[in-house]
Amino acid sequence: MLAAALAALPAAAEEIALVPYPVDHEARVDSPADARFLLDGPAGKHGFVTARDGKLWRGDGKRFRCWGVNMTGWAVGSDEIPAHGAATAYAKALARLGVNCVRLHFLDMPDSIAPIRNEGEARGPAAGPFTHRPRGLIRDDLPDSQSFNAERLDRLDFWIAELKKNGIYVNFNLNVGRRFKAGDGVPDVELLGPAKAFTYFGPELIALQKDYARKLLSHRNPYTGLRYADDPAVMTVEVVNENSLLEFWMRNWLRGERVPGGENAQLDMTPHYQKLLTGMYNDWLGKHRSAAQIASIRSMAGVAAGQPVPLMRRGDHPSAPRLRFDAELEFITQVELDFHADMRNFLRGELGVKVPIVPTADHTYFMANQPLMRTALAGDLLDAHVYWQHPAIYGRRNEPMVNAPQFSIIQKLARSTAAGKPFTVSEVNHPFPSDYGAEMIPILAAYAALQDWDGIFFYTFEAKIAGAWKPMIGDHFDITLDPVKMAQMPAGAMIFLRGDVSAAKQMLTRSYSAEQISDAARMPRAAMPYYSPGFDMTIPLRHGSRIGCIDCRPSLPAPLPAADPIVSDTGELSWQTHGGKDGLVRIDSPLSQGLVGFIAANRDVQTRHLGAEIRNRFAAITLSSLDGKPVNTSNRMLLTTTGRVENTGAKWDERRAMLTDWGRAPTLIEPITGWIQLKDLEGAVGVFAQPLDGSARPVGPEIKGKMIEPGWEIEVGTPAAASYLIRVIR
C-alpha cells in the first residue's frame, strides 16, 4: 500500500535553479527573527522538571515542553563536546533557533580521534558521506573504559553551563555506544560491539553501567557548583538508548552464533551470553511454571528432563504453542523490568537523581511495541525514535511523506504514547538527501502539538570546530548546516513550544489484553506499525491518540468515516492526498499558518491568512507571529519558504534514490519563487519582507508588498532566501 500511495507524483511545475545559501552559526548575531524569546533562562531556575498527570511540569507548576536537538559529532569538522569558545557561540545559536533542550548523546564513546570513513566506498570515492565516530568522554589510552578524559570533561562542564545560561536544558543518555575493553573484565568483550541487549543481564556490564552513571551524575560541575544529579537544568536521564532484550528476541538475535571468525550476520548473542540467558530462563521456569507445564514445554522443545530448555528462534514464533511462547515472552519482559527497576533504584536512591527517568525508547516500528510498553510504562516518561526512510533500512528513500499520511512518522510515533505518561520524541529526522526534507519540521511540530506531546529532539546537531568545517551538509543526519531545516527551526518552535497549534479536543484510547500483546509479538511486519487489526490509522491525524492500558480489558476505537482531506478535530490542521498524490498539509491557527507539500498542484487550497502562487513543484511555507499577537494583527512575523537542498555538485543515482557523489561546499537551495499572499491583515497600510541569509542576517533591500483584493502579495525568489522578516505598518 505504501508503494502505491507514493507512486504517483505530480509533474514538475517548473525547474528552479539551485543557488548557494550557506549557514554559518559563528557569524549569526541576535536578530528580530530569532525565537530565543520562547526560552526562560537560566534553565532550571523554576526548579526540577517533573512528570505528573501525563505531562512534564516545571517546578513553578507551569507546563514544560522541549524543542530540542541531539548533540553528536559524526560529520567531519564536528565535535559533540565543543571547545569553550565554540560552546559559547553554539549555545547562543541554539537559543536563537528556539531550542530549549539538548540530548547529550554518545558521551560514553572513546575520546580518541577516529579515522574518517566513506560510507559510500562501494559506489565510488566521492559517494560519501565522510564521517567519523563521535569523540566522547572515555579515555581510549587505557586498557579499560572506566576513566574520563579530564579535558573533555571540563569541556562538557563548560558546555552545559553555557547551555544553562541560555535557557537550554540537558538530557543525559547513559548507555549509548560504549565499547567495553579487555580491562573491564567483561566476557567476550571483543565480540560485543556496543553490547546491546547484553547490558540487561550480564552482571559485569550492569556493574559497569552503574559505575559510569555514578561518575557522570555525581560529578560536580565547577562552572555551576552543582552535581549533575542536583542540577535542575537536567530535565531527564535515559538509561539505555535503542536497546531492548525483547527486540533481540523478536528479531532472532538470540541465536548464540557470534564467535571469533564466524559469519556473525547481523546482531546476535555469543555462546557465553546465550548460555547465561538460557540458565536464567530455566531458573525462571522453575519458579513461575508448574511441573506439568515445564514437562509440556520440554516436550515442545524436544529436550529431555535435566537438559536446559532453549529459547526459540524467531522463525518458530508464529506456530509456537501459546504455553511455550508466552513463557518466553514473560521471562524476557521480566529481565527487562528487573534491570530497569534496579537501575531506577540506583539512580534515585544512591545517586539522588530527581528528574524523570526513561528506561528506553520505542525505536523499531516494524515490530510490535505492545510487549515493550510493559517496560516503558514502568518509567516516568515514554519516548520514541523514528526516521522517514532511514538510509540503513530503505534502498529507495526519496519519496514524499506528505503523500502517505497513514504511513507517516506521526503514525509511527503516536503508537508509543499512553494515557497518564508524558511523551517525548528523542530522535527524529528526514535524513538527507531528500527532495522532500522540508516537510518534516512543520508537519511534525504541528501534529505533535495536536497530540499534546512533551518534547521533540531532532537527530542531530553538531557543533563545528573553528577552521575545520565547510558550509555543506556533512552526513545523512546532521542538520546543523542544512539551510532549510535551520530556517524552519524557529518556526517549528513557535508552532510546538509556544503551542500555536491547539491540542486535540477529543482523546481516543485503545487497550490490550495479555493475550493480544502475545499475539502482536508474533504478527508479521505487514501489520506495522500498530499491530492492532482494525485500528483506524487516521485517528492520530484527527484526534488525540493514546494507549489506555495494557494487560487489561481490550478496546479499540471505532473506525472513523473516510475523508480526504483528513481534518483535525480542532479544524487547525488538514492533510489531503487526492488518492496518494499531490499531498498537502495545511496549518491554520491564530498564531501560525502553513502550507506544506505540492502547493502548485493545490492552488485553491489556502489558509485564513496565507496563500501561495509559486513555480516550485514542492515547498514548505510557514508564517508565524513574532510578537505574540494573532497573525491578522501582528506587526512582526517570520515567513519561511523552503524546498530542495543539495550540496554543490551532488549526483543522484538513476533512480534518484541515493547519491553517487555527496557533493561539496557550498550548500545550495531551491529558492521558492513566485508570490506569497498575506491575507486579512487588519488595518495594514504597508507590508514589507526582509530576505534573510542562512545565518538570519538581512540580505538585500526589503521587498515591498503589493496590495491586492484579499490582502497583500510579496514576490519571493530574488534574492534567494529561505526566511523573511515580515514588517507590517498599520
Where are the predicted features?
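Bacterial N-terminal signal peptides
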Residues: 1-8
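Sec/Tat signal peptide C-region and signal peptidase I cleavage site
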Residues: 9-13
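N-terminal pre-domain segments of enzymes
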Residues: 14-46
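Long, low-hydrophobicity ectodomains and other hydrophilic envelope-associated domains
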Residues: 493-494, 498-691, 709
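Active-site mouth of glycoside hydrolases
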Residues: 42-345, 349-379
